[in-house]
């Protein structure tokens, strides 16, 4: 084991004041010289994915003490994307990732901890902590709060939060009654935990396993299961072994590990937000990773599992089918799909970790010889509308749809788009453009779950494409293309599209184009008056000045 970092605040005559303060915080004489462990929690009452994490913090601290460490718990902030959806609150969601990363870095660096247990769960909390772990680079393990169970309607049908969002659109279109919508609302979110489909939170918690920063089960063991509590205890104990081996996050998160994470993402059809967060993570880890490389992973990794919202199969079903380890083990049978020699938090390789984890239900995790598609469930599109790339969750697109072209219907905000969709300004065959909603323009790159849910609920899901420099909830599905870079607020091509322009989306060829004569296009660019920031005070004003487009991970640069 390397020399303890905490010696900086515990050893020597001149550290007597430091020890005095530590004694006041409950540290005993025999604790000096033991590893000091940061227990980075994210308990918060208003977020259902986090309401139970106070208990998990206690389990972690108990396990750390039993293993010979001294735990110190602190908390980060958290935003519930579902509650923040569809109003100004969503502007704070992605920016909260940076606050979380900065706050974790601040607490851990100021107090010279020797190791860290991160207890995240929901959308921006997991990536925020991952980014911080890369910056600090001390032995760290991730243990998420776990997913909630799927809801069930009175007729036994499984549902999730996305069912409720889409239910609003269905109700407004006259497809269901008020009592049907009330039932969806009542039963859509039945327990604590991260929402029950392959949405952003669960995608990132599953990817933490593939990255090697979490033990098997992190992404799929239900929040309410006794198995989850035992998993939390086991993970905390593992950290103490990781400290002895001096394995740090940057030893684990290499180019190979990021390939493995995206391979899992492709196999499970994860949220498009994983691209945004993993690119930000790579930046913090000092790993250069391009969008083109993501397409290369998609070319060699098949789509093996179609989970909610793209189907009625939920995270609990994935767990029963063998979980992430079984999915990875199935992928490992294809040469070149994974880097099996990648290091994990235990000191074992990924190959050693997943060995023996067989698929228990091939209806949930398809075999290699019968994938949903030969290419992975995410794709990066390029073209004159997205010179620096755009993202589509191909795993959420209806089977058989690989191309869409039609006239643009342009909106300068999500609110305007939602109003236009509700008022039937969007019809079959259209391409909805929602711009000035990127990291800088939003600001905060808000999610477009309300418009996509409205489109699906009205029965237009397979018949309308939606393109935006904003992003999508993991609960979104259909022809939803987001993360268009550069964004409109930076003078990206979306800023120059007009109603009626012919737009082409070709998933197979990875193309996103608009057909406008070059002379006309240059005229529009010359006439563009620039972007006036929507927020001029507070954190969002500072954020919008420093944030970059989605192709960089939406990171902040000075």
UniProtKB/Swiss-Prot annotation:
[2Fe-2S] cluster binds at residues 122, 195. Pathway: Amino-acid biosynthesis; L-isoleucine biosynthesis; L-isoleucine from 2-oxobutanoate: step 3/4; Amino-acid biosynthesis; L-valine biosynthesis; L-valine from pyruvate: step 3/4. GO terms for molecular function: 2 iron, 2 sulfur cluster binding; dihydroxy-acid dehydratase activity; magnesium ion binding. The modification N6-carboxylysine is found at residue 124. The active site is at 473 (proton acceptor). Its cofactor is [2Fe-2S] cluster; Mg(2+). GO terms for biological process: isoleucine biosynthetic process; L-valine biosynthetic process. It comes from the Bacteria. It is an enzyme of class 4 (lyase). Disulfide bonds: none annotated. It catalyses: (2R)-2,3-dihydroxy-3-methylbutanoate = 3-methyl-2-oxobutanoate + H2O; (2R,3R)-2,3-dihydroxy-3-methylpentanoate = (S)-3-methyl-2-oxopentanoate + H2O. Gene3D superfamilies: IlvD/EDD C-terminal domain-like (3.50.30.80). Functions in the biosynthesis of branched-chain amino acids. Catalyzes the dehydration of (2R,3R)-2,3-dihydroxy-3-methylpentanoate (2,3-dihydroxy-3-methylvalerate) into 2-oxo-3-methylpentanoate (2-oxo-3-methylvalerate) and of (2R)-2,3-dihydroxy-3-methylbutanoate (2,3-dihydroxyisovalerate) into 2-oxo-3-methylbutanoate (2-oxoisovalerate), the penultimate precursor to L-isoleucine and L-valine, respectively. Belongs to the IlvD/Edd family. This is Dihydroxy-acid dehydratase.
């Amino acid at each position: 084991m390397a020399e303890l970092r905490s010696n900086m605040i515990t050893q020597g005559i001149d550290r007597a004041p430091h020890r005095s303060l530590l004694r006041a915080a409950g540290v005993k004489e025999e604790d000096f010289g033991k590893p000091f462990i940061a227990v980075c929690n994210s308990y918060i009452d208003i977020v259902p994915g986090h309401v139970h994490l106070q208990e998990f913090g206690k389990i972690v601290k108990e396990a750390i003490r039993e293993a010979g460490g001294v735990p110190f718990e602190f908390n980060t902030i958290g935003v519930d994307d579902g509650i923040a959806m569809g109003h100004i609150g969503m502007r704070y969601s992605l920016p909260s990732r940076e606050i979380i990363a900065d706050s974790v870095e601040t607490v851990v660096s100021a107090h010279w901890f020797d190791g860290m247990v991160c207890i995240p769960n929901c959308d921006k909390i997991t990536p925020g902590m991952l980014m911080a772990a890369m910056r600090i680079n001390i032995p760290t393990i991730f243990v998420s709060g776990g997913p909630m169970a799927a809801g069930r309607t009175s007729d036994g049908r499984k549902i999730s939060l996305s069912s409720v969002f889409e239910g609003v659109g269905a109700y407004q279109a006259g497809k269901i009654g008020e009592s049907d919508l009330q039932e969806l609302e009542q039963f859509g979110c039945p327990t604590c935990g991260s929402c029950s489909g392959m949405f952003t939170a669960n995608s990132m918690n599953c990817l933490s396993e593939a990255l090697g920063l979490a033990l098997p089960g992190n992404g799929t063991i239900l929040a309410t299961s006794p198995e989850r509590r035992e998993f939390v205890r086991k993970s905390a104990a593992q950290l103490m072994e990781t400290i002895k081996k001096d394995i740090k996050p940057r030893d684990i998160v290499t180019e190979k590990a990021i390939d493995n994470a995206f391979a899992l993402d492709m196999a499970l059809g994860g949220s498009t937000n994983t691209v945004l967060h993993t690119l930000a993570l790579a930046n913090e880890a000092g790993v250069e990773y391009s969008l083109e490389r993501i397409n290369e992973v998609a070319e060699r990794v098949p789509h093996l599992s179609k989970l909610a919202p793209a189907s009625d199969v939920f995270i609990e079903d994935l767990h029963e089918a063998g979980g992430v380890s079984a999915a990875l083990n199935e992928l490992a049978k294809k040469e070149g799909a994974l880097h099996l020699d990648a290091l994990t938090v235990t000191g074992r390789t990924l190959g050693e970790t997943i060995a023996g984890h067989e698929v228990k239900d091939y209806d949930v995790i398809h075999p290699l010889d019968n994938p949903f598609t030969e290419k992975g469930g995410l794709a990066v599109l390029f073209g004159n509308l997205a010179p620096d790339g755009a993202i589509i969750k191909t795993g959420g697109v209806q089977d058989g749809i690989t191309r869409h072209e039609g006239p643009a219907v342009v909106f300068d905000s999500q609110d305007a788009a939602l109003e236009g969709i509700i008022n039937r300004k969007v019809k079959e065959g259209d391409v909805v453009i929602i711009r000035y909603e990127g990291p800088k323009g939003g600001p905060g790159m808000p999610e477009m779950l309300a418009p996509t849910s409205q489109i699906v609920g009205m029965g237009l899901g397979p018949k309308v494409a939606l393109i935006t420099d904003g992003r999508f909830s993991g609960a979104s599905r259909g022809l939803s293309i987001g993360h268009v870079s550069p964004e409109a607020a930076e003078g990206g091509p979306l800023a120059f599209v007009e109603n009626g322009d012919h737009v082409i989306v070709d998933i197979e060829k990875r193309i996103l184009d608009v057909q406008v004569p070059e002379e006309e296009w240059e005229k529009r660019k010359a006439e563009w008056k620039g972007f006036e920031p929507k927020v001029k005070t507070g954190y969002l004003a500072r954020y919008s000045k420093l944030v970059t487009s989605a192709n960089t991970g939406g990171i902040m640069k000075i």
